[in-house]
C-alpha cells in the first residue's frame, strides 16, 4: 500500500507526521526574498512570484531569479540544519521554465547541501523507512520544535 503522500499543499518546516497511517511529506514554507515572506518549496511558486507564472519571463532577470531560488532553498535548509534538523522537501516539475533556472538552482543546492556533515539526501521511500523505525516519543519531541530551534539534543533524542 501507500506509505507516504508528497502532494500536500504545504506546511511549516517541521518534522513529518502520519495522517491516516500514511507519512505526510508536504511542501514547506521557506524564507523568500531575504525573509520578507515565506514561499512554498516548489519551482512553480518561484515561477509565479518571479515572472507572474510566465514560463518564458524576461531573460535578463534569470540570474537574479535563479539566485533568489537558491537563496530561499538554502535559507530553509540552514534554518533546519542549525535548528530542528527537520527534512527539507523540494518540489520540482523538471521543466525548462525561465531558461531552466529552477533545475539549475536545485543542482546548486544539492551540491552544497548533500556534502554537509550529518546530512543525507534520500528518496521519500528511504525517509519513510527511517521514520518508521524511530521511537514515537522522539518524533513527537522533534515535531514540537520550531524549525529554527536548536534544542539540547540529549533531551530530545534519548
Tell me what each language-model feature is.
Residues 4-15, 71-158:
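C-terminal domain-boundary segment and adjacent tail
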Residues 1-81, 135-146:
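Active-site-adjacent pocket scaffolds in enzyme catalytic domains
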Amino acid at each position: 500500500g501507500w506509505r507516504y503522500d508528497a502532494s500536500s499543499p504545504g506546511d511549516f518546516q517541521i518534522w513529518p507526521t502520519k495522517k491516516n497511517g500514511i507519512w505526510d511529506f508536504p511542501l514547506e514554507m521557506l524564507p523568500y526574498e531575504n525573509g520578507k515572506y515565506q514561499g512554498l518549496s516548489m519551482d512553480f511558486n518561484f515561477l509565479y512570484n518571479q515572472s507572474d507564472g510566465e514560463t518564458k519571463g524576461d531573460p535578463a532577470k534569470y540570474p537574479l531569479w535563479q539566485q533568489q531560488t537558491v537563496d530561499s532553498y538554502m535559507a530553509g535548509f540552514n534554518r533546519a540544519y542549525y535548528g530542528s534538523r527537520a527534512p527539507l522537501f523540494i518540489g520540482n516539475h523538471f521543466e525548462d521554465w525561465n531558461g531552466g533556472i529552477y533545475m539549475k538552482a536545485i543542482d546548486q543546492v544539492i551540491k552544497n547541501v548533500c556534502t554537509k556533515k550529518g546530512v543525507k539526501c534520500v528518496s521519500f521511500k528511504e525517509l519513510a523507512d527511517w521514520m518508521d523505525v524511530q521511537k514515537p516519543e522522539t518524533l513527537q519531541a522533534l515535531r514540537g520544535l520550531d524549525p529554527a530551534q536548536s534544542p539540547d539534543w540529549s533531551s530530545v533524542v534519548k
